[in-house]
A protein has these predicted regions:
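Gly/Trp-centered helix-boundary motif
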Residues: 1-246, 253, 399-422, 429-430, ...
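Alpha-helical transmembrane segments of integral membrane proteins
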Residues: 224-445
């Protein structure tokens, strides 16, 4: 144990190991944050949600930070409502139980592109008589554009670019250009815009609330996909999923392999022969093809795939490598001494044989994590990912299916790819440093 402690202290001598450990701790911190911020059930609900969950977001919107690298500033997405006080609302009582509701919101538009869409969600309260609303759009040069006049139900959505009354008044002009262009120059008019909602209620206790959604060309820190989903959900939750899959597969595989190799070496005979024959058969089995068949015909669950991955990875060439070392250790003097004082087979295997392999196990365990992380993403890209969990591989699969690279949605591919590279690089740097520390022959390389 003292040797292990001293070896771990040597990590400080390797800058690559320090960098790897730092990145791993950052990934772990992101994992903890994701699990706390977005609980498992909520993450699944969000990722499987449709228009009812993500309908207010723009489609195929790059991250907001894209504006820092572009000469043209694209409009940001935002949402305001009367419920949280971000939209101004006043109510004036009238005669015979009528009332007038004035709702407005002003914002400064200093962008070089048009929004994808603007929409208003109405939430009204009434018994029998529907409220009536008039929606107006006020431009920086003082023009007042009527969007629509209509009676609203208790829950109703108005999309500016799909409203028939508004479209008919444009005579074929694009709705967003009609709202944001200067009619004199036919270019975007920058300045302060205002959306006005004037509502009339016809019953005592009747009320109108509204939400205004401005769907810009960029959104959030990670952007959105074809279903308007915020990719940050999958990027955050993909971190604990990737680390859990990689670490569990690595630990389960290498530890089990070492134990089986130790048992076969110690008992020898038919037990050792059986283990070697199973290993040789497993070495010629099509590993990826079996995983694809399991995912296709049995289950897409990531935990089922994890179990099969561990089973297929146990009887590999590592068993023969461990066996060669255990054969030498088995003939050591301290093993003979343990036999002499009557130590049991289990005690010798788990307290004398296996501990001698730990210095070789640790670097291999750390270095093998990226391979299993990439395996999970590979299966997801092949369409065999977990159907409910948001993962990095699922993001790449969706991007590939929707032709992200051909359509210029590079962020959709790059974000999960960079996270996969960081994960692989962090464990690789730490693993190589540990290999040098625990293997003296590599220290001068």
């Amino acid at each position: 144990m003292n040797t292990l402690k001293n070896s771990f202290h040597e990590i400080l001598r390797y800058p690559s190991a320090i960098a790897g450990v730092t990145l791993i701790f950052l990934l772990l911190a992101v994992s903890v944050y994701a699990v706390i911020k977005i609980p498992y059930s909520q993450a699944i609900y969000l990722w499987r949600g449709g228009e009812d969950v993500w309908g207010a977001n723009p489609k195929f919107a790059p991250p907001a930070w894209f504006n820092f690298f572009s000469n043209k500033k694209m409009p940001l997405s935002f949402a305001v409502s009367t419920a949280d006080g971000t939209m101004t609302k006043t109510f004036t009582a009238g005669a015979q139980n009528t009332g007038t509701v004035n709702i407005s919101y002003s914002f400064d538009f200093q962008y070089d592109g048009y929004p994808q869409e603007m929409l208003i969600n109405f939430d009204s309260k009434y018994a029998q008589k529907q409220p009536f609303v008039s929606i107006n759009w006020v431009t920086p040069d003082g023009r007042n554009i009527r969007i629509d006049n209509l009676g609203i139900s208790q829950q109703q959505t108005l999309r500016f670019s799909q409203d028939q009354q508004f479209l008919q008044s444009l005579n074929g002009q694009d709705p967003m250009q009609a709202l944001f262009n200067d009619p004199k120059t036919n270019k975007i008019l920058k300045g302060k815009y205002q959306v006005q909602i004037i509502g009339v209620t016809f019953e005592q206790g009747s009320d109108i609330n509204a939400q205004f959604f401005f769907q810009g060309q960029v959104y959030g820190l990670a952007g959105t996909d074809q279903y308007r989903r915020d990719l940050m959900v999958a990027l955050l939750w993909g971190t604990p999923v990737a680390l859990a899959f990689g670490l569990l597969a690595s630990i389960g595989t290498l530890v089990t392999t070492m134990i089986i190799a130790a048992i076969g070496t110690w008992y020898g005979g038919w037990i050792d022969a059986l283990i070697q024959r199973i290993t040789e058969i497993n070495l010629v089995l099509p590993y990826l093809a079996i995983l694809i068949m399991v995912g296709t015909f049995y289950s897409h669950s990531i935990w089922v795939i994890l179990g099969v991955t561990i089973l297929l990875s146990i009887f590999t060439g590592s068993i023969k490598s461990y066996r060669a070392i255990f054969v030498q250790v088995k003939e050591s003097m301290y093993i003979e001494a343990a036999r002499a004082y009557g130590a049991s087979d289990a005690r010798i295997i788990f307290l004398y044989l296996i501990p001698r392999m730990i210095p070789l196990l640790i670097p291999g365990l750390v270095s093998s994590v990226p391979a299993f992380v990439f395996l999970e993403s590979t299966l997801a890209i092949l369409g065999l990912g977990d159907p409910v969990l948001p993962t990095w591989g699922k993001i790449i699969d969706d991007a590939f299916t929707n032709g992200a690279l051909y359509k210029g949605y590079y962020y959709w591919i790059l974000e999960p790819a960079v996270l996969l590279m960081i994960t692989g690089l962090s464990f690789a740097m730490l693993g190589f440093a540990l290999d040098r520390i625990f293997n003296p022959r590599l220290r001068d390389i």
